[in-house]
Amino acid sequence: MKTRRSSLAKQPHSIRVFGFLKWGYSLGLALATVVGSGAGQEAHSGRILVMPRDDGGRAALAEAHRGRGRQVERIFPRLGYLQVVRLARGESVSRAVAECQTLSVVAWAEPDWVVTANGLFPNDPYFQNGTQWALNNYGQNGGVADADLDAPEGWDVVATASNIVVAIVDSGVRATHEDLSENLWRNPVDGTPGFNALTGGHDPWDENGHGTHLAGTIAAVANNQRGVAGVAWRARLMVCKFLDASGNGYTADAISCLEFARSNGAHIVNLSWGAGTFSLALSNALWAAQSEGILLVAAAGNNASNNDLVPYYPASLPLENLVAVAASTRTDDRWTFSNYGPASVDLFAPGLAVYSTASGGDSAYESRNGSSMAAAHVSGALALMRQQSPGSTSAEILAALRRAVDSKSAFADQCLTGGRLNLRKALDWPAVSLGSSHGMAQVRVAGVAGHSYVVAASTNLTEWAALKTNTAPANGQWLLTDSDSTNFPGRFYRAQPGP
């Protein structure tokens, strides 16, 4: 359930939350076109995914594989012993899947689908010169003023997320980049920054550039007089590579990355890729991550289609901890190619001409478009929210994220919230306390100096009436006396970020 969180107080009776990836054509990979539930979709031509029915059947299943000349390449013990099975030479994927599904010891089998990549005021030069419009838009380069995240206002509240690990499951990262190296997560065993599912090793070097760009948007080193500023200063970036130099990869390798992230303390996983074909194996892996409180951020896709009508996975998966993000422009419109969905997409975030770190060199930067970039902005925002509220549940944080939008007419029928992410609203929730004076309720609001807040009252927690909007003074605190409170014993009050 998507709920709204607010700072509440009750009067006593006396007073009282892209470049994208899609299933499709792949370069340099062995492919098979599979006919069936995923008709026309590309899959690995020599590999399938098989789920054993129970522990007792695994030995019999292994014998069945051997008898057909197949080999189990990989097993995921924490995902019900899901198997990655290498087929016999010349064996077709469709036939192998169909045959496995007839075995009494198999719960289900599916192809190994292909995914493809899509494409404080810090002193960082590209922030200061206005190139990073997504963080601070004052109308530069044809934009509309304030069609941004309100990042500087959010950073007034919290700017760093040094306790939070964000896993980027993508094409890897250029680990030596001047704006990224300091913020990379390091494995306590060997000091490496993550995992490479393509090699099985721990060197997730980016040969494509997609992952490096996402990394900079999420958590480029800020205030270092270089390059760009990330949304979450000092967040730790865990790099999990499953896409190759052409931006192509397989479900099995994505699952390996998810399992690595889950096993090594990731708080947030960025999923800037997707497909039109449902994978039960991938869904189970994401559900397992969610069950441990990990927040999942998925790009809505770049097909200019309605995800309510044509689902796009993993963004369309019905997971409580998953937020689906569409791409907005510098004028607060939907980016032409961004997917949308009144019920299946949660919110918009900047995804056009997003400037960030590039994999071409240690001081390289570039601009990219897509819901991938939009998702990265949300991952950074969630890192700051998790840092700020370590005791909050994942459901509470995502409810707050979904509430923290600027409502815009362009998004009213395009996503669940009808708005674009506002970082300041996600972070700037004031404390509220109640007192009394001469028989009337006094509401004390403690926020950030110079920020505006709205105090509202309700008798039923459903219908709220705004009492006053005020800008917090230098000490951040102000007091409101409700002269009407004597007529409403049991009245509730709340304070929220103002306009």
How should these model regions be labeled?
Residues M1-F20:
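N-terminal secretory signal peptides that target proteins for export/translocation
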Residues G38-N123, T131, E153, S162, ...:
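Inhibitory N-terminal propeptides of secreted protease zymogens
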Residues V239, S256-A285, E292-I294, N321-A324, ...:
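C-terminal subdomain of the subtilisin-like protease fold in secreted/lumenal serine endopeptidases
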Residues P122-M238, F242-G249, D253-I268, W287, ...:
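Active-site core segment of subtilase-fold serine proteases
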Residues K22-V34:
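Bacterial N-terminal signal peptides
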Residues V50, V85, C100, V106-A109, ...:
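Residue-level detector of buried hydrophobic side-chain packing
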Residues I294, Y312-Q387, G391:
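Extracellular S/T/G-rich loop segment that most often corresponds to the catalytic His/Ser-adjacent loop
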Residues D428-P499:
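Short, composition-biased motifs enriched in small/polar/acidic residues
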